[in-house]
C-alpha cells in the first residue's frame, strides 16, 4: 500500500509539473485533470472519500471552466508542444528544484517512508470521512461561498493574463 501511495505522489508531481510547464492552455488541462484525479485518489486511499469527491467536483468544475474560457479566448494558431526545448528546460528546472527541496528537507531516504491509511490501526478508529461530512454540512457553507467568489476572481485574472499588454490575443466575443 505504501508503494501505491508513493506512486500516486509521483503522479501528482508529474501532473503539477505538466500544469506548471505547459506552453499553452490547450495542454494545461491534461496536467490539471491528471493532478486532480491523482490527488483525489490519494485522499481516497487515506480514507476521506467524501471530501475527495467534493473537492474533485469543485476543483474540476471551477478550474476547467477557467481553462475553457482561456482556451476559447486565446488566439494561438500554432501552440508550442511539450516536446520543445524551452518546455523541456522548464520541466528540468522544476524537477531540479523539487529534488533540491527533497534533499535539503531530509526526505531522500525513501525506505523509511510510511503512510498510514484509515484501517492501518484496526477497525477501532473512527473514519475521518464521517467528520468531514458533518463539517461540510455545518461549517462549510461560508467556505463554499468564499471559494465560489474566489473562482470567479480567478476567472477574470486568467482572462486578463491571457489578454496580455494589448488586445492581441483576445478576440471579440
Curated annotation (Swiss-Prot):
Membrane topology: Multi-pass membrane protein
Keywords per UniProt: Electron transport, Membrane, Mitochondrion, NAD, Respiratory chain, Translocase, Transmembrane, Transmembrane helix, Transport, Ubiquinone
First and last residue of the signal peptide: none
GO terms assigned for molecular function: NADH dehydrogenase (ubiquinone) activity
Name of a matching Pfam family: Oxidored_q3
GO BP annotations, alphabetical order: mitochondrial electron transport, NADH to ubiquinone; mitochondrial respiratory chain complex I assembly
Reactions the enzyme catalyzes: a ubiquinone + NADH + 5 H(+)(in) = a ubiquinol + NAD(+) + 4 H(+)(out)
Principal location class: mitochondrion
InterPro entries in the cross-refs: ComplexI_Subunit6, NADH_UbQ/plastoQ_OxRdtase_su6, Nuo/plastoQ_OxRdtase_6_NuoJ
EC id: 7.1.1.2
A cellular-component GO term for this protein: mitochondrial inner membrane
Transmembrane residue ranges: 1-21, 27-47, 48-68, 87-107, 139-159
Tagged with keyword Cell cycle: no
Enzyme class: translocase
Function summary: Core subunit of the mitochondrial membrane respiratory chain NADH dehydrogenase (Complex I) that is believed to belong to the minimal assembly required for catalysis. Complex I functions in the transfer of electrons from NADH to the respiratory chain. The immediate electron acceptor for the enzyme is believed to be ubiquinone.
Family note: Belongs to the complex I subunit 6 family.
PANTHER family: NADH UBIQUINONE OXIDOREDUCTASE SUBUNIT ND6 (PTHR11435), NADH-UBIQUINONE OXIDOREDUCTASE CHAIN 6 (PTHR11435:SF1)
Name by which UniProt lists this protein: NADH-ubiquinone oxidoreductase chain 6
Organism the protein comes from: Coturnix japonica (Japanese quail)
Gene: MT-ND6
Amino acid at each position: 500500500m505504501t508503494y501505491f501511495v508513493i506512486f500516486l505522489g509521483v503522479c501528482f508531481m508529474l501532473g503539477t509539473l505538466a500544469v506548471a510547464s505547459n506552453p499553452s492552455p490547450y495542454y494545461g488541462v491534461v496536467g490539471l485533470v491528471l493532478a486532480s484525479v491523482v490527488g483525489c485518489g490519494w485522499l481516497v486511499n487515506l480514507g476521506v472519500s467524501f471530501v475527495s469527491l467534493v473537492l474533485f467536483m469543485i476543483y474540476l468544475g471551477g478550474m476547467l471552466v477557467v481553462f475553457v474560457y482561456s482556451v476559447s479566448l486565446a488566439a494561438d494558431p500554432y501552440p508550442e508542444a511539450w516536446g520543445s526545448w524551452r518546455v523541456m528546460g522548464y520541466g528540468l528546472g522544476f524537477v531540479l528544484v523539487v529534488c533540491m527541496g527533497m534533499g535539503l528537507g531530509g526526505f531522500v531516504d525513501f525506505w523509511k517512508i510510511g503512510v498510514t491509511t484509515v484501517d492501518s490501526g484496526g477497525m477501532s478508529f473512527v473514519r475521518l470521512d464521517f467528520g468531514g461530512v458533518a463539517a461540510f454540512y455545518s461549517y462549510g457553507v461560508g467556505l463554499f461561498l468564499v471559494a465560489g467568489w474566489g473562482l470567479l476572481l480567478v476567472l477574470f485574472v486568467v482572462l486578463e493574463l491571457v489578454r496580455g499588454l494589448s488586445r492581441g490575443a483576445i478576440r471579440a466575443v
